[in-house]
């Protein structure tokens, strides 16, 4: 990783030029840096950063000039280009938010209002992941929730469940610092898996049924929902082993290695497993609204803010889960 001087991007048709004010570092950014270092010939260099807020500087051709110059804005990190759609901060073809200048799509801009510090609007992107995960869970009245893993994704899920008035929520993480953040996010019960079973605490709250054969006449309907927010091999299998029948499992954590499950466990328990990815534009807008209205307080999630020049230090710091959750870099 390096901080370099490059030419400013130029907004094309329907695009705008933005000066990033803050940009968060995502776990996917860490993976990309590690992959590029390990395989420089296969993974091209790119300007990272897809969690951003910035100031509108200029309009490209064919725009409607929807907002005054100087408006604080954010956007889903998706850009239409002559070479097709590109993910901002995740593609070598377009500049990401870890820069002093950034090109975005005018039609996807969202103005940032309210009395919050503008930098917190950069957290709308990871919070939107939680909005989408909760929306995908097929929630029913009386559901009880277990969130496994209290990093940025798990905290977003907890915050979104509570913002929607849902609960009880049990959160589990080995890190004391992240358990403390889970409490601040609104978790009703926080468990250290090294000391006690989060599944026991959760099923007691849920009143989960005693496992029984689906061949019995008694209808089975569980009210247990798990959000797997860790994303490492073995976690999904552990969840499947541990949950009661008919639990809904929402896989939010991004596991990038091969993993193994035993299907018969899911079959005999009639488990429902739903994999989710990112969010929809309306969910991003809802996440931003929850932040600017104070419905969700993301300030505790941000454990450090550093200048862009300290990017390498920030990436190293973020690899310490007991110390940091979300680090924002300030390009401007």
Sequence positions of predicted segments:
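Adenosine-nucleotide cofactor-binding segment
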Residues: 147-150, 162-234
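Residue-level marker of beta-strand positions
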Residues: 51, 71-72, 101, 132, ...
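Glycine-rich beta-strand-centered segment in the early N-terminal region that forms part
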Residues: 7-23, 37-79, 113-115
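NAD(P)H dinucleotide-binding glycine-rich loop of Rossmann-like/cofactor-binding domains
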Residues: 75-148
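Glycine-rich phosphate-binding loop and adjacent beta-alpha segment
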Residues: 166, 230-293, 331-332
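C-terminal hydrophobic helical "lid"/dimerization subdomain
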Residues: 214, 237, 281-332
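Glycine-rich Rossmann-fold phosphate-binding loop(s) that bind the pyrophosphate
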Residues: 59, 126, 149-152, 254
């Amino acid at each position: 990783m390096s901080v370099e001087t490059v030419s400013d991007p130029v907004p094309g048709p329907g695009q705008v030029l933005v000066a990033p004010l803050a940009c968060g570092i995502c776990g996917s950014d860490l993976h990309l840096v590690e992959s590029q270092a390990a395989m420089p010939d296969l993974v091209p260099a790119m300007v990272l950063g897809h969690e951003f807020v910035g100031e509108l500087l200029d309009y490209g051709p064919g725009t409607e000039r929807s907002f005054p110059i100087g408006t604080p804005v954010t956007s889903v990190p998706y850009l239409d280009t002559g070479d097709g759609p590109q993910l901002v901060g995740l593609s070598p073809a377009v500049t990401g938010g870890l820069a002093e200048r950034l090109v975005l799509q005018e039609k996807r801009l969202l103005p940032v209002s309210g009395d919050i510090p503008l930098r917190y609007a950069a957290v709308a992107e990871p919070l939107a992941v939680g909005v989408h995960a909760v929306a995908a869970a097929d929630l029913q009245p009386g559901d009880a929730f277990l969130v496994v893993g209290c990093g940025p994704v798990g905290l977003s899920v907890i915050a979104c469940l509570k913002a929607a008035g849902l609960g009880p929520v049990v959160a589990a993480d080995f890190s004391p610092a992240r358990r403390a953040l889970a409490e601040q996010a609104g978790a009703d019960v926080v468990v250290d898996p090294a000391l006690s079973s989060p599944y026991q605490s959760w099923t007691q709250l849920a009143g989960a049924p005693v496992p029984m054969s689906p061949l019995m006449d008694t209808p089975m309907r569980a009210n247990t929902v798990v959000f797997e927010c860790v994303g490492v091999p073995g976690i999904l299998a552990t969840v499947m082993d541990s949950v009661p029948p008919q639990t809904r499992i929402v896989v939010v954590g991004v596991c990038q290695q091969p993993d193994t499950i035993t299907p018969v466990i899911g079959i005999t328990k009639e488990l429902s497993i739903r994999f989710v990815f990112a969010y929809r534009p309306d969910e991003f807008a809802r996440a931003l609204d929850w932040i600017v209205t104070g419905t969700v307080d993301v300030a505790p999630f941000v454990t450090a803010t550093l200048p862009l020049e300290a990017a390498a230090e920030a990436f190293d710091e973020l690899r310490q889960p007991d110390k940091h959750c979300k680090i924002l870099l300030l390009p401007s």
